[in-house]
């Protein structure tokens, strides 16, 4: 939930104390809140973002925040309330941007910005799923009263006189009605109308500021210049070096990105039909491009996996009749899963499609086991297909049910984890669990029917050489496997020692593997921030920005460069900053390079600009979690720590962090040395002369910072009226000599006689995190290191070099990674516990489940070794894969344990029963495992968007 307010003319410190503090005191502790962060800037702007848990209801959260802000309003400055406080619920990342451009010089940036507001913005806001539409770098119309302080003083007027005249003569008022009841003898009533609010610059110029006793009149045009122009010039936006009105589209939480984007594009096609000649629009940035490309790649992988699984099944069963039975289970299970996804409210996204790809290799398992067992009985006992099927199902039904329910026992509990991690697990695990259950239903119903109808006894015809070689290899492998099993089973102590070594190896490798939350993806764009010396004007920043844009446009891999000059995601509104969003060409047009190589080249070239510092960043892996990829650390001034202590701590941390090779892209949000002019008011003298202290401050604010007076009507809308001194009167410290206030006796008193002005420095913006003044440290792990390692190093530096009154917290993606960091153990514990409890209930035994559980660590060791050898990280996807692997290992173990238990119950020897079960189940287990592995192979080899 985002909160925005403004206190024009106020410094960052004033905004922090007068606006941020009372609002945050009320907001703190809102139910479901994870953390809140705010920014107060020297432009008078205040913005706060309250981040809630994914389980929170966004509507209730926004209402709760709104109610709490109402409680804070009594402690806020009147001008802040007059300007309005907005509370909006939205997904925190942009879905897309729309740029209105024109090659006609009459359509300047002010016209484009207001055309977009009047004719485009409101229509887009009404699209279902759109949370907010922001006019970035807006140039909203306003009636600017450019006052001339020297002329006002010559006439004996002050800025308060101007404000009073505007408030008196530019107002809406009801004039009454002729013939309103109770009256008699009238047939009609007539409303009385009059000129209320003014609507043109000419009308404002004619406002009477003072009528003199001699009959002369001083009008507004005598002491000020009036013009209709932009309300603010603090930021500006553009596309590819040209001025443009840039609209940022934000979704409502929970809305479907693809659907919202499609509706926005359709709406823009209709709206653009009414554009004036010479005006057009572009959509340079569209997050759904990455989403659709990723899903397209997954669809390809899905098809490739299906082909490979069918091929493996055919080579294993060696008959098109037998192959048809497991293959039929795939579409039935997947189509059924789609139905349940609809019931659960899931969408087709990367996680659910990943679940479906993995499910392809699993849903054939049960049917393969049925077919293989039926064919084995037909061959060894010479039974008819019907009799063989009947006998096979008598022995298999309970095992099939047990294996499927064990898989569900693995997946379902994990889906109840909280937070973002639980949300990621939930869609994946439930998708697989449903597909597995449906495949079991197919294996228990349709597969036996098909076996009895289409399978044929072996005709004795010699098989082709490929099948013979496969069978020969399988027989040899089975024979060697049984030989190893027979020898190993005679040495239980050695076996348990080896098992202990497996556990130790898992523990060691788990500690050595670097951790992260999610792998970094090429999302098709990156951001560049230009930082000029503090106090630089927008004109100076614009020159450097234009130069950088021209350079980036020459890059063959760049499609668009979108710029917002005068703003930065790290520090907010600041004329010495510029943010460039570099949108790359489609992935297929840059296959011979990577986004990292492109960024390295850009960073190297832009660092040659002596006028500025350059920071490059990739977007966060999960849109909206943080301002960029990498880590986001909050250094907090706690206890009695001052802003100066925080600056010193941030400098210390940055000093040691920049020495570490594991870290890169380090930057701090602190702006501590911004040039400022301090006016030291002589309060005794002010009181002696009878000058209201409020007039001293309001005069200075109105002339140098602008003051909002009231509103006027135009284009069926309401716009604001501002007073500010003309540019030549607010360029230098000496201009304050021309600012006058009235003493109690009516004499005009210059402000310079009431205080001294001197240059100093102070913060340009003040950030707060959970009510503490904070410095945001951004950075990322260097090539070859993980985000988890980078975060550990930052925490280590903080522990060793920062004082006790400086606290450390994480936000954005780093917060979620830290929260999920200890969940691997929890996930595996849940999995093992539920498998054990389920099997104990299934077999009514505490010992039988142990046989299944003992096989699981061996499978987990293979996963850990694979990740370690390939240089991968322990992230959410690894944990998902580990859960999947444990489930499959348990399923395979049950096939052996179930058969062995039946033989033991029938009087068989324990050891021989186990060996016989392993021999009999070797082929189906090998076939199903091979089908699953090859089903995943296309995912392993995939490239392009979403492949990480």
Write out the residue ranges for each language-model feature.
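Helix-loop junctions and hydrophobic alpha-helical segments within the transmembrane domains
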Residues: 284, 291, 295, 371, ...
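Hydrophobic alpha-helical segments
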Residues: 361, 392-395, 402-463
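Juxtamembrane "pre-transmembrane" interface segments
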Residues: 134-141, 146, 222-225, 236-311, ...
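Surface-exposed amphipathic alpha-helical segments in non-transmembrane regions
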Residues: 18-35, 49-141, 160-174, 193-232, ...
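Signature of alpha-helical transmembrane segments and their immediate interfacial
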Residues: 396, 465-519, 919
